[in-house]
Protein backbone atom coordinates (compact mmCIF):
# COMPACT_ATOMS: atom_id res chain seq x y z
CA UNK A 1 0.00 0.00 0.00
CA UNK A 2 2.85 2.34 0.87
CA UNK A 3 4.52 1.61 -2.47
CA UNK A 4 1.25 2.32 -4.26
CA UNK A 5 0.85 5.65 -2.42
CA UNK A 6 4.43 6.62 -3.28
CA UNK A 7 3.74 5.84 -6.93
CA UNK A 8 0.60 8.01 -6.92
CA UNK A 9 2.48 10.81 -5.15
CA UNK A 10 5.32 10.61 -7.69
CA UNK A 11 2.85 10.76 -10.59
CA UNK A 12 1.21 13.84 -9.06
CA UNK A 13 4.60 15.52 -8.63
CA UNK A 14 5.51 14.75 -12.25
CA UNK A 15 2.16 16.12 -13.42
CA UNK A 16 2.60 19.32 -11.39
CA UNK A 17 6.18 19.69 -12.67
CA UNK A 18 4.99 19.27 -16.26
CA UNK A 19 2.26 21.84 -15.67
CA UNK A 20 4.77 24.36 -14.30
CA UNK A 21 7.10 23.74 -17.26
CA UNK A 22 4.28 24.42 -19.71
CA UNK A 23 3.25 27.52 -17.75
CA UNK A 24 6.84 28.80 -17.70
CA UNK A 25 7.17 28.15 -21.43
CA UNK A 26 4.00 30.17 -22.03
CA UNK A 27 5.04 33.06 -19.78
CA UNK A 28 8.48 33.39 -21.33
CA UNK A 29 7.13 33.08 -24.88
CA UNK A 30 7.24 36.28 -26.94
CA UNK A 31 3.77 35.53 -28.29
CA UNK A 32 2.44 35.65 -24.71
CA UNK A 33 3.75 39.17 -24.13
CA UNK A 34 2.55 40.36 -27.53
CA UNK A 35 -0.93 38.92 -27.00
CA UNK A 36 -1.22 40.41 -23.50
CA UNK A 37 -0.02 43.82 -24.72
CA UNK A 38 -2.50 43.87 -27.60
CA UNK A 39 -5.40 42.69 -25.43
CA UNK A 40 -4.62 45.38 -22.86
CA UNK A 41 -4.63 48.05 -25.58
CA UNK A 42 -7.86 46.76 -27.11
CA UNK A 43 -9.45 46.52 -23.66
CA UNK A 44 -8.37 50.06 -22.79
CA UNK A 45 -9.76 51.50 -26.03
CA UNK A 46 -13.03 49.61 -25.59
CA UNK A 47 -13.32 50.65 -21.93
CA UNK A 48 -12.83 54.32 -22.83
CA UNK A 49 -15.45 54.14 -25.57
CA UNK A 50 -17.95 52.34 -23.29
CA UNK A 51 -17.35 54.84 -20.48
CA UNK A 52 -17.99 57.71 -22.84
CA UNK A 53 -21.17 56.01 -24.03
CA UNK A 54 -22.31 55.45 -20.43
CA UNK A 55 -21.40 59.01 -19.42
CA UNK A 56 -23.73 60.61 -21.92
CA UNK A 57 -26.80 59.38 -23.73
CA UNK A 58 -25.90 61.64 -26.64
CA UNK A 59 -22.44 60.07 -26.97
CA UNK A 60 -24.03 56.61 -26.97
CA UNK A 61 -26.46 57.65 -29.70
CA UNK A 62 -23.60 59.28 -31.61
CA UNK A 63 -21.52 56.09 -31.52
CA UNK A 64 -24.45 54.03 -32.77
CA UNK A 65 -25.04 56.53 -35.56
CA UNK A 66 -21.35 56.24 -36.47
CA UNK A 67 -21.91 52.48 -36.66
CA UNK A 68 -24.84 52.93 -39.06
CA UNK A 69 -22.87 55.36 -41.24
CA UNK A 70 -19.90 52.98 -41.17
CA UNK A 71 -22.10 50.08 -42.31
CA UNK A 72 -23.43 52.15 -45.23
CA UNK A 73 -19.87 53.14 -46.15
CA UNK A 74 -18.68 49.52 -46.02
CA UNK A 75 -21.60 48.36 -48.18
CA UNK A 76 -20.64 50.89 -50.86
CA UNK A 77 -16.92 50.08 -50.83
CA UNK A 78 -15.38 48.14 -53.71
CA UNK A 79 -14.34 45.17 -51.61
CA UNK A 80 -15.24 41.50 -51.60
CA UNK A 81 -18.90 40.95 -50.57
CA UNK A 82 -17.80 38.44 -47.92
CA UNK A 83 -15.87 41.19 -46.13
CA UNK A 84 -18.89 43.50 -46.37
CA UNK A 85 -21.17 40.87 -44.83
CA UNK A 86 -18.77 39.98 -42.00
CA UNK A 87 -18.10 43.56 -40.91
CA UNK A 88 -21.73 44.61 -41.31
CA UNK A 89 -22.92 41.73 -39.11
CA UNK A 90 -20.31 42.44 -36.45
CA UNK A 91 -21.13 46.17 -36.29
CA UNK A 92 -24.90 45.58 -36.21
CA UNK A 93 -24.71 42.83 -33.56
CA UNK A 94 -22.12 44.61 -31.37
CA UNK A 95 -22.29 48.28 -32.45
CA UNK A 96 -19.66 49.83 -30.19
CA UNK A 97 -17.21 46.90 -30.19
CA UNK A 98 -17.69 46.45 -33.95
CA UNK A 99 -16.87 50.09 -34.67
CA UNK A 100 -13.74 49.94 -32.51
CA UNK A 101 -12.55 46.70 -34.13
CA UNK A 102 -13.15 48.03 -37.63
CA UNK A 103 -11.09 51.17 -37.08
CA UNK A 104 -8.28 49.06 -35.57
CA UNK A 105 -8.29 46.07 -37.94
CA UNK A 106 -10.79 46.70 -40.71
CA UNK A 107 -8.86 48.46 -43.41
CA UNK A 108 -6.71 46.11 -45.47
CA UNK A 109 -4.51 48.61 -47.29
CA UNK A 110 -0.89 48.84 -46.23
CA UNK A 111 0.79 52.03 -45.06
CA UNK A 112 0.62 54.84 -47.60
CA UNK A 113 4.37 55.37 -47.56
CA UNK A 114 5.04 51.69 -48.31
CA UNK A 115 2.49 51.75 -51.11
CA UNK A 116 4.12 54.84 -52.59
CA UNK A 117 7.56 53.19 -52.52
CA UNK A 118 6.27 50.04 -54.23
CA UNK A 119 4.57 52.04 -56.97
CA UNK A 120 7.81 53.95 -57.52
CA UNK A 121 9.81 50.72 -57.89
CA UNK A 122 7.24 49.13 -60.19
CA UNK A 123 7.28 52.17 -62.45
CA UNK A 124 11.09 52.29 -62.39
CA UNK A 125 11.36 48.66 -63.58
CA UNK A 126 8.61 48.82 -66.21
CA UNK A 127 10.99 48.82 -69.19
CA UNK A 128 12.71 45.68 -67.86
CA UNK A 129 9.44 43.77 -67.47
CA UNK A 130 7.96 43.68 -70.95
CA UNK A 131 6.74 40.62 -72.82
CA UNK A 132 8.93 39.64 -75.72
CA UNK A 133 6.74 40.09 -78.82
CA UNK A 134 7.88 36.77 -80.33
CA UNK A 135 7.09 34.88 -77.10
CA UNK A 136 3.65 36.43 -76.82
CA UNK A 137 2.89 35.76 -80.50
CA UNK A 138 4.02 32.15 -80.18
CA UNK A 139 1.80 31.53 -77.15
CA UNK A 140 -1.13 33.30 -78.82
CA UNK A 141 -0.83 31.11 -81.92
CA UNK A 142 -0.49 27.97 -79.81
CA UNK A 143 -3.39 28.59 -77.42
CA UNK A 144 -5.33 31.90 -77.36
CA UNK A 145 -7.04 30.96 -74.09
CA UNK A 146 -3.74 30.30 -72.29
CA UNK A 147 -2.31 33.47 -73.80
CA UNK A 148 -5.22 35.46 -72.34
CA UNK A 149 -4.52 34.01 -68.89
CA UNK A 150 -0.85 34.90 -69.24
CA UNK A 151 -1.65 38.37 -70.53
CA UNK A 152 -3.73 39.08 -67.44
CA UNK A 153 -0.67 38.34 -65.28
CA UNK A 154 1.57 40.50 -67.49
CA UNK A 155 -0.80 43.46 -67.52
CA UNK A 156 -1.86 43.42 -63.88
CA UNK A 157 1.02 41.86 -61.96
CA UNK A 158 3.55 43.42 -64.39
CA UNK A 159 5.64 40.25 -64.78
CA UNK A 160 6.13 38.88 -68.33
CA UNK A 161 5.88 35.34 -69.66
CA UNK A 162 9.15 33.62 -70.61
CA UNK A 163 10.52 30.81 -72.71
CA UNK A 164 14.15 29.64 -72.39
CA UNK A 165 13.43 28.20 -68.95
CA UNK A 166 13.32 24.70 -67.49
CA UNK A 167 11.55 23.63 -64.31
CA UNK A 168 11.97 20.85 -61.77
CA UNK A 169 9.13 19.89 -59.43
CA UNK A 170 9.65 18.54 -55.91
CA UNK A 171 6.97 16.38 -54.28
CA UNK A 172 8.26 16.96 -50.75
CA UNK A 173 10.71 19.25 -49.00
CA UNK A 174 12.97 16.25 -48.35
CA UNK A 175 13.68 16.12 -52.11
CA UNK A 176 14.11 19.86 -52.56
CA UNK A 177 16.55 20.47 -49.72
CA UNK A 178 19.65 18.67 -51.11
CA UNK A 179 19.12 20.34 -54.50
CA UNK A 180 18.83 23.75 -52.84
CA UNK A 181 22.06 23.10 -50.92
CA UNK A 182 23.83 22.03 -54.13
CA UNK A 183 22.76 25.17 -56.00
CA UNK A 184 23.66 27.49 -53.11
CA UNK A 185 27.17 26.03 -53.00
CA UNK A 186 27.60 26.88 -56.70
CA UNK A 187 26.68 30.56 -56.29
CA UNK A 188 29.22 32.95 -57.80
CA UNK A 189 27.77 36.47 -57.65
CA UNK A 190 24.65 36.78 -55.52
CA UNK A 191 22.11 34.92 -53.38
CA UNK A 192 18.75 36.51 -52.59
CA UNK A 193 16.54 34.78 -50.01
CA UNK A 194 13.04 35.85 -48.91
CA UNK A 195 10.99 33.64 -46.57
CA UNK A 196 8.00 33.91 -44.25
CA UNK A 197 9.39 31.51 -41.62
CA UNK A 198 12.97 30.68 -40.66
CA UNK A 199 13.60 28.42 -37.69
CA UNK A 200 16.87 27.20 -36.24
CA UNK A 201 17.59 23.56 -36.94
CA UNK A 202 19.23 21.21 -39.43
CA UNK A 203 17.82 22.98 -42.48
CA UNK A 204 18.59 26.54 -41.46
CA UNK A 205 22.02 25.80 -39.96
CA UNK A 206 23.07 24.01 -43.16
CA UNK A 207 21.94 26.95 -45.28
CA UNK A 208 23.38 29.53 -42.88
CA UNK A 209 26.83 27.92 -43.00
CA UNK A 210 26.79 28.12 -46.81
CA UNK A 211 25.61 31.74 -46.76
CA UNK A 212 28.37 32.68 -44.33
CA UNK A 213 30.99 31.00 -46.53
CA UNK A 214 29.67 32.67 -49.66
CA UNK A 215 29.58 36.08 -48.02
CA UNK A 216 33.23 35.60 -47.02
CA UNK A 217 34.02 34.81 -50.69
CA UNK A 218 32.51 38.13 -51.77
CA UNK A 219 29.13 36.85 -52.94
CA UNK A 220 26.33 39.39 -52.41
CA UNK A 221 24.15 37.54 -49.87
CA UNK A 222 20.84 39.15 -48.87
CA UNK A 223 18.03 37.84 -46.70
CA UNK A 224 14.48 39.05 -45.97
CA UNK A 225 12.32 37.41 -43.34
CA UNK A 226 8.86 38.33 -42.08
CA UNK A 227 8.61 39.92 -38.65
CA UNK A 228 5.52 37.97 -37.62
CA UNK A 229 6.38 34.67 -39.31
CA UNK A 230 9.65 34.56 -37.35
CA UNK A 231 8.29 36.08 -34.14
CA UNK A 232 8.69 32.86 -32.14
CA UNK A 233 11.33 31.12 -34.27
CA UNK A 234 14.19 33.65 -34.33
CA UNK A 235 15.75 35.73 -31.54
CA UNK A 236 14.91 39.41 -31.24
CA UNK A 237 17.09 41.47 -33.62
CA UNK A 238 18.43 38.33 -35.27
CA UNK A 239 19.28 40.42 -38.31
CA UNK A 240 22.17 41.94 -36.34
CA UNK A 241 23.73 38.48 -35.88
CA UNK A 242 23.47 37.83 -39.62
CA UNK A 243 24.97 41.19 -40.51
CA UNK A 244 28.01 40.34 -38.37
CA UNK A 245 28.47 37.26 -40.56
CA UNK A 246 28.51 39.41 -43.70
CA UNK A 247 24.91 38.58 -44.64
CA UNK A 248 22.81 41.63 -45.51
CA UNK A 249 19.45 41.25 -43.80
CA UNK A 250 16.16 43.13 -43.53
CA UNK A 251 12.92 42.34 -41.69
CA UNK A 252 9.58 42.86 -43.38
CA UNK A 253 7.09 44.73 -41.20
CA UNK A 254 8.65 43.92 -37.79
CA UNK A 255 5.86 42.82 -35.49
CA UNK A 256 5.22 45.17 -32.59
CA UNK A 257 2.62 44.72 -29.84
CA UNK A 258 0.72 47.80 -31.03
CA UNK A 259 -2.81 47.69 -32.42
CA UNK A 260 -2.17 48.62 -36.02
CA UNK A 261 -3.86 47.58 -39.27
CA UNK A 262 -0.48 47.33 -41.00
CA UNK A 263 0.31 44.24 -38.91
CA UNK A 264 -2.30 42.37 -40.99
CA UNK A 265 -0.08 42.54 -44.09
CA UNK A 266 2.68 39.92 -44.07
CA UNK A 267 5.35 38.81 -46.54
CA UNK A 268 4.27 35.21 -47.15
CA UNK A 269 6.54 34.77 -50.18
CA UNK A 270 9.21 32.08 -50.38
CA UNK A 271 11.99 32.91 -52.83
CA UNK A 272 15.58 31.82 -53.27
CA UNK A 273 17.43 33.30 -56.26
CA UNK A 274 20.99 32.36 -57.21
CA UNK A 275 23.01 34.37 -59.74
CA UNK A 276 19.84 35.49 -61.49
CA UNK A 277 19.16 32.26 -63.36
CA UNK A 278 18.34 29.68 -60.66
CA UNK A 279 15.21 30.22 -58.58
CA UNK A 280 13.19 28.27 -56.01
CA UNK A 281 9.66 28.85 -54.74
CA UNK A 282 6.73 26.88 -53.34
CA UNK A 283 5.22 26.22 -49.94
CA UNK A 284 8.44 25.24 -48.18
CA UNK A 285 9.82 27.54 -45.47
CA UNK A 286 13.29 27.24 -43.94
CA UNK A 287 12.41 25.05 -40.96
CA UNK A 288 12.96 21.38 -40.14
CA UNK A 289 9.31 20.29 -40.27
CA UNK A 290 9.22 21.23 -43.97
CA UNK A 291 11.86 18.59 -44.73
CA UNK A 292 10.52 16.11 -42.14
CA UNK A 293 13.55 16.45 -39.90
CA UNK A 294 11.13 17.34 -37.10
CA UNK A 295 7.71 15.75 -36.61
CA UNK A 296 4.86 18.24 -36.40
CA UNK A 297 1.33 17.19 -37.30
CA UNK A 298 2.50 13.89 -38.77
CA UNK A 299 4.22 13.71 -42.15
CA UNK A 300 4.66 17.17 -43.69
CA UNK A 301 3.66 17.12 -47.36
CA UNK A 302 4.81 20.22 -49.23
CA UNK A 303 5.90 21.05 -52.76
CA UNK A 304 8.29 23.38 -54.56
CA UNK A 305 9.62 24.15 -58.00
CA UNK A 306 13.11 25.09 -59.20
CA UNK A 307 13.44 27.24 -62.31
CA UNK A 308 16.56 27.63 -64.42
CA UNK A 309 16.62 30.26 -67.12
CA UNK A 310 15.19 33.61 -68.11
CA UNK A 311 11.97 33.35 -66.07
CA UNK A 312 14.01 33.68 -62.87
CA UNK A 313 14.32 37.35 -63.82
CA UNK A 314 10.78 37.93 -62.55
CA UNK A 315 11.75 36.52 -59.15
CA UNK A 316 14.87 38.69 -59.01
CA UNK A 317 12.86 41.85 -59.65
CA UNK A 318 10.29 40.86 -57.00
CA UNK A 319 13.09 40.56 -54.46
CA UNK A 320 14.80 43.80 -55.50
CA UNK A 321 11.51 45.68 -55.16
CA UNK A 322 10.92 44.33 -51.67
CA UNK A 323 14.51 44.97 -50.60
CA UNK A 324 14.41 48.59 -51.72
CA UNK A 325 11.01 49.26 -50.12
CA UNK A 326 11.89 47.75 -46.74
CA UNK A 327 15.16 49.68 -46.69
CA UNK A 328 13.38 52.86 -47.86
CA UNK A 329 16.17 53.40 -50.34
CA UNK A 330 15.88 56.42 -52.62
CA UNK A 331 18.55 55.18 -55.03
CA UNK A 332 17.58 53.70 -58.37
CA UNK A 333 18.16 49.97 -58.79
CA UNK A 334 20.73 48.92 -61.38
CA UNK A 335 18.56 46.17 -62.86
CA UNK A 336 21.01 45.35 -65.63
CA UNK A 337 23.53 44.17 -63.03
CA UNK A 338 21.23 41.23 -62.21
CA UNK A 339 20.21 40.01 -65.69
CA UNK A 340 20.05 36.18 -66.01
CA UNK A 341 22.49 36.04 -68.94
CA UNK A 342 25.06 38.17 -67.13
CA UNK A 343 26.28 35.22 -65.06
CA UNK A 344 25.37 32.32 -67.35
CA UNK A 345 27.36 31.33 -70.40
CA UNK A 346 25.50 30.12 -73.45
CA UNK A 347 21.80 29.74 -74.15
CA UNK A 348 19.24 28.44 -71.69
CA UNK A 349 17.23 25.32 -72.39
CA UNK A 350 13.59 25.96 -73.21
CA UNK A 351 10.55 23.96 -72.12
CA UNK A 352 7.13 25.52 -72.60
CA UNK A 353 6.16 28.85 -71.05
CA UNK A 354 6.92 29.94 -67.49
CA UNK A 355 5.69 33.08 -65.73
CA UNK A 356 6.57 33.82 -62.09
CA UNK A 357 4.28 36.47 -60.63
CA UNK A 358 3.45 38.10 -57.33
CA UNK A 359 0.31 39.33 -55.62
CA UNK A 360 0.22 42.23 -53.18
CA UNK A 361 -2.31 44.09 -51.02
CA UNK A 362 -1.24 47.30 -52.80
CA UNK A 363 -4.30 47.50 -55.01
CA UNK A 364 -7.79 46.15 -55.52
CA UNK A 365 -6.57 43.37 -57.84
CA UNK A 366 -6.59 39.90 -56.29
CA UNK A 367 -4.11 38.45 -58.76
CA UNK A 368 -3.65 35.11 -57.02
CA UNK A 369 -7.37 34.39 -56.87
CA UNK A 370 -7.92 35.60 -60.44
CA UNK A 371 -5.16 33.33 -61.76
CA UNK A 372 -6.82 30.39 -59.99
CA UNK A 373 -10.28 31.40 -61.25
CA UNK A 374 -8.98 31.63 -64.82
CA UNK A 375 -7.67 28.06 -64.61
CA UNK A 376 -10.96 26.76 -63.16
CA UNK A 377 -13.15 28.62 -65.65
CA UNK A 378 -11.10 27.53 -68.69
CA UNK A 379 -10.72 23.87 -67.64
CA UNK A 380 -12.19 21.30 -70.02
CA UNK A 381 -11.26 17.96 -68.44
CA UNK A 382 -9.95 18.35 -64.90
CA UNK A 383 -8.61 20.65 -62.18
CA UNK A 384 -6.61 19.19 -59.28
CA UNK A 385 -5.98 21.49 -56.32
CA UNK A 386 -3.78 21.22 -53.21
CA UNK A 387 -4.32 23.70 -50.38
CA UNK A 388 -3.71 23.57 -46.61
CA UNK A 389 -6.68 25.86 -45.95
CA UNK A 390 -10.00 26.03 -47.78
CA UNK A 391 -11.71 29.26 -46.71
CA UNK A 392 -13.15 30.65 -49.92
CA UNK A 393 -15.38 33.49 -51.04
CA UNK A 394 -18.52 33.28 -53.16
CA UNK A 395 -16.61 33.79 -56.43
CA UNK A 396 -14.33 30.82 -55.82
CA UNK A 397 -17.17 28.63 -54.55
CA UNK A 398 -19.28 29.45 -57.61
CA UNK A 399 -16.41 28.73 -60.02
CA UNK A 400 -15.58 25.36 -58.43
CA UNK A 401 -19.22 24.25 -58.30
CA UNK A 402 -19.97 25.41 -61.85
CA UNK A 403 -16.92 23.60 -63.22
CA UNK A 404 -17.94 20.36 -61.48
CA UNK A 405 -21.56 20.68 -62.63
CA UNK A 406 -20.28 21.22 -66.19
CA UNK A 407 -18.52 17.86 -66.20
CA UNK A 408 -15.01 18.98 -65.22
CA UNK A 409 -13.29 16.59 -62.79
CA UNK A 410 -12.61 18.94 -59.85
CA UNK A 411 -10.60 17.50 -56.97
CA UNK A 412 -9.35 19.29 -53.88
CA UNK A 413 -6.81 17.90 -51.42
CA UNK A 414 -6.59 19.25 -47.85
CA UNK A 415 -4.76 18.12 -44.68
CA UNK A 416 -5.84 15.16 -42.59
CA UNK A 417 -3.97 16.48 -39.54
CA UNK A 418 -4.33 20.28 -39.24
CA UNK A 419 -1.86 22.79 -37.88
CA UNK A 420 -4.70 25.05 -36.69
CA UNK A 421 -7.79 23.21 -35.42
CA UNK A 422 -10.11 26.22 -35.63
CA UNK A 423 -9.12 26.86 -39.25
CA UNK A 424 -9.59 23.15 -40.02
CA UNK A 425 -13.14 23.23 -38.64
CA UNK A 426 -13.78 26.22 -40.88
CA UNK A 427 -12.19 24.44 -43.86
CA UNK A 428 -14.50 21.46 -43.40
CA UNK A 429 -17.53 23.75 -43.29
CA UNK A 430 -17.15 24.29 -47.06
CA UNK A 431 -17.19 20.59 -47.91
CA UNK A 432 -20.95 20.03 -48.10
CA UNK A 433 -21.70 22.63 -50.78
CA UNK A 434 -18.74 21.50 -52.87
CA UNK A 435 -19.62 17.80 -52.57
CA UNK A 436 -23.23 18.44 -53.55
CA UNK A 437 -21.98 20.13 -56.74
CA UNK A 438 -19.82 17.12 -57.61
CA UNK A 439 -16.42 18.32 -56.38
CA UNK A 440 -14.29 15.49 -54.95
CA UNK A 441 -12.46 16.23 -51.69
CA UNK A 442 -9.56 14.26 -50.20
CA UNK A 443 -7.86 14.61 -46.82
CA UNK A 444 -4.18 13.64 -46.58
CA UNK A 445 -4.15 11.06 -43.77
CA UNK A 446 -0.42 10.75 -42.89
CA UNK A 447 -0.21 14.35 -41.72
CA UNK A 448 -0.29 17.99 -42.74
CA UNK A 449 -0.60 18.98 -46.40
CA UNK A 450 1.00 22.42 -46.86
CA UNK A 451 1.28 22.37 -50.67
CA UNK A 452 -0.33 25.09 -52.79
CA UNK A 453 -0.78 23.95 -56.38
CA UNK A 454 -3.21 23.85 -59.31
CA UNK A 455 -2.94 21.62 -62.37
CA UNK A 456 -5.41 21.34 -65.24
CA UNK A 457 -5.91 19.48 -68.54
CA UNK A 458 -2.27 18.24 -68.75
CA UNK A 459 -1.28 21.72 -69.95
CA UNK A 460 -1.41 24.37 -67.27
CA UNK A 461 -0.47 24.66 -63.61
CA UNK A 462 0.57 26.93 -60.75
CA UNK A 463 2.97 26.24 -57.88
CA UNK A 464 3.61 28.88 -55.26
CA UNK A 465 2.72 30.27 -51.85
CA UNK A 466 -0.94 31.21 -52.39
CA UNK A 467 -3.40 29.41 -50.11
CA UNK A 468 -7.13 29.28 -50.76
CA UNK A 469 -7.98 31.53 -47.82
CA UNK A 470 -8.74 35.20 -47.27
CA UNK A 471 -5.39 36.10 -45.75
CA UNK A 472 -3.41 34.78 -48.72
CA UNK A 473 -5.78 36.12 -51.34
CA UNK A 474 -6.38 39.59 -49.86
CA UNK A 475 -3.87 40.57 -47.17
CA UNK A 476 -0.45 39.04 -47.85
CA UNK A 477 2.40 39.47 -50.30
CA UNK A 478 2.47 36.18 -52.22
CA UNK A 479 4.19 34.63 -55.22
CA UNK A 480 3.50 31.85 -57.68
CA UNK A 481 4.68 30.38 -60.98
CA UNK A 482 2.22 30.03 -63.86
CA UNK A 483 3.38 27.16 -66.09
CA UNK A 484 2.15 26.09 -69.52
CA UNK A 485 3.14 22.98 -71.49
CA UNK A 486 6.23 22.33 -69.41
CA UNK A 487 7.12 18.75 -68.45
CA UNK A 488 6.53 19.53 -64.76
CA UNK A 489 2.79 19.74 -65.48
CA UNK A 490 2.76 15.95 -65.74
CA UNK A 491 4.87 15.72 -62.56
CA UNK A 492 2.35 17.83 -60.63
CA UNK A 493 -0.53 15.69 -61.89
CA UNK A 494 1.28 12.41 -61.12
CA UNK A 495 2.11 13.63 -57.63
CA UNK A 496 -1.53 14.47 -56.95
CA UNK A 497 -2.75 11.07 -58.15
CA UNK A 498 -0.06 9.21 -56.17
CA UNK A 499 -0.84 11.22 -53.04
CA UNK A 500 -4.54 10.29 -53.34
CA UNK A 501 -3.53 6.77 -52.28
CA UNK A 502 -2.72 8.20 -48.83
CA UNK A 503 -5.94 10.19 -48.60
CA UNK A 504 -9.44 9.62 -47.31
CA UNK A 505 -12.11 10.64 -49.81
CA UNK A 506 -14.79 12.70 -48.10
CA UNK A 507 -18.34 11.46 -48.67
CA UNK A 508 -21.54 13.54 -48.23
CA UNK A 509 -22.38 11.46 -45.15
CA UNK A 510 -19.33 12.95 -43.41
CA UNK A 511 -21.02 16.36 -43.43
CA UNK A 512 -24.53 15.11 -42.68
CA UNK A 513 -23.48 13.01 -39.68
CA UNK A 514 -21.63 15.77 -37.82
CA UNK A 515 -23.19 16.76 -34.51
CA UNK A 516 -25.50 19.76 -34.45
CA UNK A 517 -23.27 21.75 -32.10
CA UNK A 518 -20.30 21.54 -34.47
CA UNK A 519 -22.45 22.49 -37.46
CA UNK A 520 -23.79 25.56 -35.63
CA UNK A 521 -20.22 26.54 -34.73
CA UNK A 522 -19.14 26.11 -38.38
CA UNK A 523 -21.99 28.34 -39.57
CA UNK A 524 -20.97 31.06 -37.13
CA UNK A 525 -17.32 30.78 -38.19
CA UNK A 526 -18.34 30.93 -41.87
CA UNK A 527 -20.12 34.24 -41.32
CA UNK A 528 -16.96 35.82 -39.92
CA UNK A 529 -14.41 33.85 -41.99
CA UNK A 530 -12.93 36.94 -43.73
CA UNK A 531 -12.00 38.41 -40.34
CA UNK A 532 -10.19 35.31 -39.06
Enumerate the predicted regions with their spans.
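Glycine- and other small-residue-rich loops at beta-strand/loop junctions that grip anionic moieties
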Residues: 196, 389, 423
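N-terminal localization/anchoring segments of enzymes in phospholipid and broader phosphate metabolism
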Residues: 1-370, 374, 378, 418, ...
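Thr-Gly-centered strand-to-loop micro-motif
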Residues: 386-387, 414, 444, 463-464
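Catalytic-core elements of nucleic-acid end-processing and repair enzymes
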Residues: 452
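Surface segments flanking catalytic/ligand-binding clefts of nucleic-acid enzymes
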Residues: 440
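Short glycine/threonine-rich loop-to-helix capping motif typified by GTGT followed
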Residues: 398, 424-428
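Helical hairpin unit composed of two closely spaced alpha helices linked by a short loop
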Residues: 379, 389-410, 415, 420
Amino acid sequence: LKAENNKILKEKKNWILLLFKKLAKLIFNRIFYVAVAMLVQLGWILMMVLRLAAYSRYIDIGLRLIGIVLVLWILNKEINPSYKLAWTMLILILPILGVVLYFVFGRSRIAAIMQQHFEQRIEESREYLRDRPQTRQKLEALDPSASNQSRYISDVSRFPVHENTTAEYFQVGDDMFPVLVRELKQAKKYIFIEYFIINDGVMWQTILNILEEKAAEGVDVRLIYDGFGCLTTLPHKYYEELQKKGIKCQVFNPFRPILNIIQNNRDHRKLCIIDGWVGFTGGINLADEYINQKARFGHWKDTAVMLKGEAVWNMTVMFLHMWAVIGRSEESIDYEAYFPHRYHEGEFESDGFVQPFCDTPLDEEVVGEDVYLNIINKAKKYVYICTPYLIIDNEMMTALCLAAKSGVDVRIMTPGIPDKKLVFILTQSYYRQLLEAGVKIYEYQPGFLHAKSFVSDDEIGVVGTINLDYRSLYLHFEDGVWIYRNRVIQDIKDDFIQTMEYCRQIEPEFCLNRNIGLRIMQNIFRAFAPLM
